[in-house]
Amino acid sequence: MRRAGAACSAMDRLRLLLLLLLLLGVSFGGAKETCSTGMYTHSGECCKACNLGEGVAQPCGANQTVCEPCLDSVTFSDVVSATEPCKPCTECLGLQSMSAPCVEADDAVCRCSYGYYQDEETGRCEACSVCGVGSGLVFSCQDKQNTVCEECPEGTYSDEANHVDPCLPCTVCEDTERQLRECTPWADAECEEIPGRWITRSTPPEGSDVTTPSTQEPEAPPERDLIASTVADTVTTVMGSSQPVVTRGTADNLIPVYCSILAAVVVGLVAYIAFKRWNSCKQNKQGANSRPVNQTPPPEGEKLHSDSGISVDSQSLHDQQTHTQTASGQALKGDGNLYSSLPLTKREEVEKLLNGDTWRHLAGELGYQPEHIDSFTHEACPVRALLASWGAQDSATLDALLAALRRIQRADIVESLCSESTATSPV
């Protein structure tokens, strides 16, 4: 019985020992599975990994991993690793320009300069293909895509070889024009005004009411209305015939007559205004001489009378003259065909609208070479530097800028420049 009890006790001890060993194995195995790097020091400690922007200075072994930060614009590390050191940044060479700088956690991103694209097979920058005359742009040349062109379909044309302009719609002649040349894929249609087409007028029938001029002197209308009404009456008198003017020679001979009549009307109007002002000043001077010394000046808003029978409020006359002078100053300020004559607010608006790479396309249309365009990228505001450089040229006219904007399909900027009127006439 004692031997049987001893044997059972030994078996229990053996089972307990196996159970303990199994538990220890499971615990050690679980500890190793939680190590993300899968590497351990000689003492069994899990090796730590270096974060993004850090590289391994001393690998894990006898001691724990030693990390060091990468240097901005010199080295980078874009992986979490216990073995990878910081890698040197990529340099953009030749026809490449940097679109994203090298930082501690990301490498530099290079792209081909304006007018070039990166060939996927060779990796080199190749010149963008040019759409020839009669072909237009479908997809622009950028990054890893070359220019995609198409032959201009019917109703469109392209008369320039470049890699930025699509096929343009053909010009349609108006009813008052005749077509000299049809539109082809490589040339636009050409139109010409039809000469000798005049508006015919019929004489009024007998017995109709005819307005007779009034003997009373009417109130002087504004200058622009007086000129328009006088010219309209003159043209009606000369052209008021029931027979249309058919011969071209007669129409050409009447043009000097119209010009002479218009000049006479303008001279007469100027003389009339000068006489009225001189007469008014003369009466004011006579009134000042005959007024007593202690007489107070007329209050604001008093009516001024002249021999013409016209009653004018002095305050309204002063406000109208001030408004006229202000409008004239605005007209003089806004006049001019140079880009530098634009108001500062308009130039700043153009700079804001030229976002992205649009200013590069505009620079190419204004005649700048790719090397010169790249030099603007070193400025704080490349768009402002481009427009300032171009605006200093004698040929920097507003018409040239509008034409270049139309060629790069930026009609919104053209509309913004043309929307604001320079001045308004006083009423």
From Swiss-Prot:
Modification comment: N-glycosylated. O-glycosylated. Phosphorylated on serine residues.
Gene3D superfamilies according to UniProt: 6.10.250.1780, Death Domain, Fas, Tumor Necrosis Factor Receptor, subunit A, domain 2
All ranges on the Extracellular side of the membrane: 32-254
Glycosylation site positions: N63
Ranges annotated as biased composition (Polar residues): 200-217, 284-294, 308-329
SMART domains reported for this sequence: DEATH, TNFR
Phenotypic effect of disruption: Embryos are present at the expected Mendelian rate at 15.5 dpc, but mutant mice display about 40% perinatal lethality. At 11.5 dpc, mutant embryos display mildly to severely dilated blood vessels with thinner walls. The dorsal aorta is particularly affected. Many embryos show massive dilatations, ruptures and blood leakage. Surviving animals display small size and hind limb ataxia at 13 days after birth. When held by their tails, they respond by stretching their hind legs pointing upwards. The diameter of their sciatic nerve is strongly reduced.
Cytoplasmic topology ranges: 276-427
Annotated region described as Mediates interaction with KIDINS220, given as residue ranges: 329-344
Region feature Disordered, mapped onto this chain: 197-223, 284-334
GO biological process, one term: positive regulation of fibroblast proliferation
Listed InterPro entries: DEATH-like_dom_sf, Death_dom, Neurotrophin_rcpt-DD, TNFR/NGFR_Cys_rich_reg, TNFR16_TM, TNFR_16, TNFRSF16_N
Transmembrane segment boundaries: 255-275
Induction: Expression oscillates in a circadian manner in the suprachiasmatic nucleus (SCN) of the brain and in liver. Expression seen at higher levels during the light period and lower during the dark period.
Membrane topology of the entry: Single-pass type I membrane protein
Location(s), subcellular: Cell membrane; Cytoplasm; Perikaryon; Cell projection, Growth cone
Position of the signal peptide: 1-31
Tissues and organs where the protein is expressed, per its UniProt entry: Detected in Schwann cells. Detected in embryonic brain, in hippocampus neurons (at protein level). Detected in brain and spinal cord.
Keyword terms: Apoptosis, Biological rhythms, Cell membrane, Cell projection, Cytoplasm, Developmental protein, Differentiation, Disulfide bond, Glycoprotein, Membrane, Neurogenesis, Phosphoprotein, Receptor, Repeat, Signal, Synapse, Transmembrane, Transmembrane helix
Origin superkingdom: Eukaryota
GO cellular component: cell surface; cell-cell junction; cytoplasm; dendritic spine; growth cone; neuromuscular junction; nucleoplasm; perikaryon
Domains as described in the record: The death domain mediates interaction with RANBP9. It also mediates interaction with ARHGDIA and RIPK2.
Family matches, as PANTHER family: TUMOR NECROSIS FACTOR RECEPTOR, TUMOR NECROSIS FACTOR RECEPTOR SUPERFAMILY MEMBER 16
Role according to the record: Low affinity neurotrophin receptor which can bind to mature NGF, BDNF, NTF3, and NTF4. Forms a heterodimeric receptor with SORCS2 that binds the precursor forms of NGF (proNGF), BDNF (proBDNF) and NTF3 (proNT3) with high affinity, and has much lower affinity for mature NGF and BDNF. Plays an important role in differentiation and survival of specific neuronal populations during development. Can mediate cell survival as well as cell death of neural cells.
Binding partners and assembly: Homodimer; disulfide-linked. Heterodimer with SORCS2. The extracellular domains of the heterodimer bind NGF. The cytoplasmic region of the heterodimer binds TRIO. NGF binding mediates dissociation of TRIO from the receptor complex. Interacts with TRAF2, TRAF4, TRAF6, PTPN13 and RANBP9. Interacts through TRAF6 with SQSTM1 which bridges NGFR to NTRK1. Interacts with BEX1. Interacts with BEX3. Interacts with KIDINS220 and NTRK1. Can form a ternary complex with NTRK1 and KIDINS220 and this complex is affected by the expression levels of KIDINS220. (Microbial infection) Binds to rabies virus glycoprotein Gs.
Protein name listed in UniProt: Tumor necrosis factor receptor superfamily member 16
Organism, scientific name: Mus musculus
Taxonomic placement: Eukaryota, Metazoa, Chordata, Craniata, Vertebrata
